UniProtKB/Swiss-Prot annotation:
SUPFAM superfamilies: RmlC-like cupins. It comes from Prunus persica (Peach). The keyword Signal applies. The keyword Secreted applies. Pfam families: Cupin_1 (PF00190). Residues 53-199 form the Cupin type-1 domain. Belongs to the germin family. Interacts with ABP20. It comes from the Eukaryota. This is Auxin-binding protein ABP19a. Mn(2+) binds at residues 101, 103, 108, 147. Keywords: Apoplast, Auxin signaling pathway, Cell wall, Disulfide bond, Glycoprotein, Manganese, Metal-binding, Receptor, Secreted, Signal. Residues 1-18 form the signal peptide.
């Protein structure tokens, strides 16, 4: 009898801030912190804080990766602050690609609604998992693992990724390596890539040295 009572008490103590209150709409006038935005005063909350219309507009895919991500994270959608969820729109033009990247703060579920997308991730033991996804398919990407999406057809593809955090974070591997001022010689030593290729990639992505 004691254990169930203790367990219930523990669950109550470990409840999130959002479960103590009905919601915690982001207050953009206050600074953002590791735990998210401060809560807007309830008297200033409106229905518009819980509605976001930006995902109905196609992203601009006329760029080097032929892709666009339109986020509805806490920074854009105040109503998701503190709720442990968020959403985005992914547009992939023909030949479009989202390079290897990670979300340090969230797992991801990808729903394909148009076209064909080749998606995959690499586990911590370096085992790759990949699948060609079509309309109606969903795929999960565990938190923190490197993953990618590639347009697998000759027509535009559209998907909606959702996340287990209002601020999932993002680090793109190619940008981390080549869109910076790390010395080419150091990158060559740590990646076993040819210096000429590294300089070429730095030139394409905006890196120096």
């Amino acid at each position: 009898m004691i254990f169930p009572i203790f367990f219930t008490f523990f669950l109550l103590l470990s409840s999130s801030h959002a479960s103590v209150q009905d919601f915690c709409v982001a207050d953009y006038k206050a600074p953002d912190g590791p735990a998210g935005y401060s809560c807007k005063k309830p008297a200033k909350v409106t229905i518009n804080d819980f509605v976001y219309s930006g995902l109905g507009i196609a992203g601009n895919t006329t760029n080097i990766i032929k892709a666009a991500v339109t986020p509805a994270f806490a920074a854009q959608f105040p109503g998701v602050n503190g709720l442990g969820i968020s959403l985005a729109r992914l547009d992939l033009g023909p030949g479009g690609v989202i390079p290897f990247h990670t979300h340090p703060g969230a797992s991801e579920v990808l729903l394909v609604v148009q076209g064909t997308i080749i998606a995959g991730f690499v586990a911590s033991d370096n085992t790759p998992y990949l699948k060609t996804l079509k309309k109606g398919d969903i795929m999960v990407f565990p938190q923190g693992l490197l993953h990618f999406q590639v347009n697998g057809g000759g027509t535009p593809a559209l998907a909606f990724p959702s996340f287990s955090s209002p601020s999932p974070g993002l680090q793109i591997l190619d940008f981390a390596l080549f869109k910076n001022d790390l010395p080419t010689e150091l990158i060559a030593q740590t990646t076993f890539l040819d210096a000429a290729q590294i300089k070429k990639l730095k030139g394409v992505l905006g890196g120096t040295n």
